[in-house]
Amino acid sequence: MKRLLYRWFSSFSAFQYRLDRRCTRAGSLALGILGAAVVIGLDTNRTVGYQVFTLVLALVILSAASSLVFRGRFAARRILPRFASAGVPMTYRVAIANHTRRRQAGLVLLDELTDPRPSFEEFVTAREPGEERRNWFDRQVGYPRWAWLVSQKRGAVIPPRPLPPLDAVGETEVTVEITPLRRGHLRFRGVTLARPDPLGLVQALKSIALPQSLLVLPKRYPMAEIRIAGTRKYQPGGVALASTVGDSEEFVSLRDYRAGDPMRRIHWKSFARVGRPVVKEYLDEFFVRHALVLDTFTSQVGDPVFEEAVSVAASIAISMQTQESLLDLMFVGPEAYCFTAGRGVAHTEQLLEVLACVGPCRDKPFRALHHAVLDRHDALSGCVCVLLGWDDARQELVRHLEALGTPTRVLIVGRRETLDRLALPGHVHRLEVGRIAEGLACL
């Protein structure tokens, strides 16, 4: 039964998509009038319904027939920026080349994304937020869940772009507006040139395959830098890490060579003067290193709380000054990850790229993140934890960090009703979904 419903929903969505592309606004209105005329025509005493139905049907058939043939040869080139940001409108350029010897006018550019329909496994296993509050029929049939999944997988809104007249064997470049709806890779499938028929009801289409992708960064909120008490810590990466982050070791003195000393530390002038190997001695390197810990442990697909937590982590990452310190982004996906930025190791922008693609972890316990953080606590000057709850496992992580003397800031992201039920300590900051910006402004 579930598979039959899935096939019906999928076929209906495909039909609706093709109909929306084929019909102009006037064409959609004509179809609506056609349907209304059918309903009115059920009363055989009202001949006006038959007359309207016949007239509109004839117009639609003529328009559809005239749009069957679209002779034209075109090429397209899409010029995308490096990044976009979720929820922020932006523009990009598309170049259209007319390879025919006729001037083409009245065309409309439709830029197409990949198919947003979910797979059967996603349809069966996913749960729409608040689905338990729907009526029995909606829960069993699942169409609201289908519509929600399609909206979650639809990457952006791209309105049709009317084109200026295309000269024969010429090229025209236009700007297209797009509003990314979610973070992650936005995948384009191709572009379609639509030509309305003389009645303006139905469009003839000419599709051009043009696969491309654009990385959409998470939504960010304005906020001040989070101040974390902490001291410079010894970094066990040695000379290689110290030179990478820009802190060369401090020269102390010269001493006789010992077995195992690297050749690059030999002081050649002293070697030539005294006749035996002499090396330069340095102090160990210390600098500030903070951790940004992101809780990815949620079972829901497209969980808005998780998406807001990712946005909070992105906002914190860009607010922290990494010119004089390191920032480790830590989370658990298929495995435990730690990405470092600052002091020449990497730019904060690269952390945003990572956050654009991070997904929820459903097959590992929270303790996996606990161990990953504690394995690096010796090198940490401070820690910021962005959590999705306040259960025993998460409280244990915070207590363990505080017991080890690591200054820790804790941010809990959740819905208001969920946060109200939690007994949060005074040092734990709550961030309500829908009021994230206000919560971050209070930090």
What are these regions (language model features)?
Residues 48-49, 57-339, 382-386, 400:
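An amphipathic, basic-hydrophobic helix/alpha-beta surface used to engage anionic
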Residues 318-443:
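Acidic, glycine-rich A-domain
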Residues 31, 57, 250, 264, ...:
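Alpha-helical structural motif
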Residues 12, 16-19, 271, 312, ...:
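Generic hydrophobic, helix-prone segments enriched in Leu/Val/Ile
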Residues 6, 39, 223, 260, ...:
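Intrinsically disordered, low-complexity regions
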Residues 1-77:
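Extracellular/lumenal glycan-associated context and N-glycosylation machinery
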